[in-house]
Regions:
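Short helix-capping/hinge motifs at transmembrane helix termini and TM-loop junctions
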Residues: 52-61, 89, 143-151, 180-182, ...
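Membrane-interface helix starts
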Residues: 25-47, 241-247
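Alpha-helical transmembrane segments and their short interhelical loops
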Residues: 117-191, 240-263
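Hydrophobic alpha-helical transmembrane segments of multi-pass membrane transport proteins
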Residues: 47-52, 71-146, 192, 197-198
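Transmembrane helix segments
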Residues: 54, 58-60, 177-223, 227
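Membrane-interfacial helix-loop-helix junctions in multi-pass membrane proteins
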Residues: 30, 202-255
Length: 280
């Protein structure tokens, strides 16, 4: 028997559950202590909803497209995209904290525990997704006063879609963080990923309008995983299922997560930190 099976053989399901609970609790406490992170997570989509939507309401009229059964206001259309945007930014913020923990040596301490790496990273991913769910539902509560009122069942039906999209976007952030060597470089890389994904999607405008203006950009949007996260959320809010988007989100989530687990190096960043300390 190899060393790896011997290392994990004595761990029970209860011990795995305790480990998961501890990681989720730690991430929850970190989020509560970073109140400005919670405020900024809400301010960003609210600015788009109250200002951007008001300015473009008359310019970008929305025709009857699935899952909608009638004409809708522009702010109603962009609401699912803003929910996905909250999850996208939260996934990148969670990955930023992982880069910080790695540079400080905290992740190395965590990953030398008897639990397998895939479980520890998956637990971090689940914790980040739960935080994003809190942000999303607070935003939905505020948006309700702005006459964004999906069917009551939609608030429950959208939960699985939010979990899947949150896991996919969090796994993407984790994969990116595994390739970033230093904390200082992550902000630039994060912006390079976030804004192209957000704007080259169906979050702000229907894809049929993009196709009319630029067929090439339309195909880019179709290949964008964020587009399918938005559409999965959009359909689920109205009690419907977009099978293609579900398949793409699940497939990308698996690919991103496997890539992050294989590429993650808990020691990366430590030599640079030691070098800076020696210079001081």
């Amino acid at each position: 028997m190899s060393a790896a099976p011997l290392r994990f053989a004595h761990l029970s399901i209860a011990q795995y559950a305790i480990c998961l609970k501890g990681i989720v609790w730690r991430e929850g406490l970190r989020f509560l202590h970073q109140r400005e992170r919670f405020v900024s997570a809400l301010v960003r989509p609210l600015v788009w909803l109250f200002i951007f939507a008001a300015g473009f309401r008359q310019v970008l009229g929305i025709s009857i497209i699935p899952p909608y059964e009638t004409y809708i206001l522009y702010e109603v259309y962009i609401a699912p995209g803003l929910l996905a945007m909250i999850q996208l930014f939260n996934g990148m913020q969670s990955s930023l904290s992982m880069v910080y923990d790695r540079e400080m040596g905290n992740m190395r301490t965590l990953l030398v525990s008897p639990f397998p790496r895939w479980f520890l990273l998956s637990s971090k991913l689940i914790a980040g997704t739960l935080v994003s769910l809190l942000q999303v539902y607070v935003f939905l509560a505020i948006a309700w006063f702005w006459e964004i009122e999906p069917p009551p069942i939609g608030y429950i039906a959208v939960l699985p879609a939010l979990i899947l999209s949150g896991l996919m976007l969090g796994a993407l952030g984790m994969l990116i963080s595994s390739a970033v060597k230093q904390l200082e470089n992550f902000a630039g890389v994060m912006n390079f990923v976030i804004f192209p994904m957000f704007f080259a999607s169906s979050a702000l405008y229907p894809l049929w309008r993009v196709q009319e203006a630029s067929p090439a950009l339309y195909y880019v949007c179709q290949l964008n995983p964020f587009t399918h996260a938005v559409e999965l959320i959009r359909f689920a809010l109205y009690g419907k299922l977009n099978v293609l988007s579900l398949a793409v989100v699940c497939g990308c989530m698996a690919v991103f997560m496997i890539g992050a687990i294989l590429a993650y190096d808990p020691a990366r960043g430590l030599p640079a930190r030691r070098g800076r300390a020696a210079e001081d």
